[in-house]
Amino acid sequence: MTQPIARSIPLQVVSGDTAAPASLQTGVKQIGGDKINRSPVQFVDAPVLRKPSWIRVRIPSGNAVQNLKAKLRENRLVTVCEEASCPNIHECFSHGTATFMILGEVCTRRCSFCDVAHGRPKPPDASEPTSLATTVADMGLKYVVVTSVDRDDLRDGGAQHFVDCISAIRASAPKTRIEILTPDFRGKGRMDRALEILATSPPDVFNHNIETVPDLYPNVRPGADYQWSLTLLQRFKAQHPTIATKSGIMLGLGETMEQVQATLRDLRAHDVDMITIGQYLQPTPHHHPVMRYWTPEEYKALEDYGNALGFSHVASGPMVRSSYHADRQAAGAGVAA
């Protein structure tokens, strides 16, 4: 059996700068240290763990990646694959698949694990749904994932823009199955408004990531709430019993096996059908450090545990990401393509 690497490392968390942050200009991206330095928590004196042999990404040859990037730029579209520095980008792009990120490239949150830029976003682009639908149809995609940055500046959290994109894709590519990976729509009345809007044109799969165990939320997802995310998933399922719900969790942020298992139980108790479990990788030295690399055997144990809980599909492995092989995950859960 593969031995675990560095079961834990010391981590000192300190409060961020208490001085009032400089005002942000609309559309300006804050990335890396500029973003994390505005976070309410900072990480200091954390040693860097060496990546184990099972954390490896094969870079395929050929022009498929550049061709797809050119098509995206031509239509002024953004993928979370690029913005979040996903390690699977070359594999997915080489197969002509991508997870499209709508509502801009600037997020209103400052999560310590995420490489997407922070700042004050621009207003939604009214032409984006049409551009997205045209690209999906041109690529002949059978399955598409649509996600977004957090848009706490919008009254509905961006729900109407999601619906506009779903409707446009269905008009241009009626056979394409659509998965949406949404933010939490947190805020007074925002979840109610978002769910009401999404009901007008629901997706084939509704995905919202829980990301980590509840005890780590203050350091990993400042601005989010564990129970709020569970409630969002449960309420969508209650409104749409026949639509698959999905969530994802990262490992390596300091959680224990028992905490992960408890989170899986919580997700099933809130009627989540599908789950993805993968290794967190630090995007830059400024982000939350990797506390531990979980072994392939542990991922297999969690897969078995999730299956025993009754998830319709469990994708568990070091390089698994929420939208990685999403079409295969959906097919495994009975969502026809």
Swiss-Prot record:
Pathway: Protein modification; protein lipoylation via endogenous pathway; protein N(6)-(lipoyl)lysine from octanoyl-[acyl-carrier-protein]: step 2/2
Residue ranges of domain Radical SAM core in the record: 93-312
Residues reported to bind [4Fe-4S] cluster 1: 81, 86, 92, 323
GO molecular function, one term: metal ion binding
Cofactor dependence: [4Fe-4S] cluster
CDD domains linked: Radical_SAM (cd01335)
Compartments where found: Cytoplasm
Pfam family, one: LIAS_N
Similarity comment text for this entry: Belongs to the radical SAM superfamily. Lipoyl synthase family.
Protein name per the record: Lipoyl synthase
Species per Swiss-Prot/TrEMBL record: Xanthomonas campestris pv. campestris (strain B100)
Gene: lipA
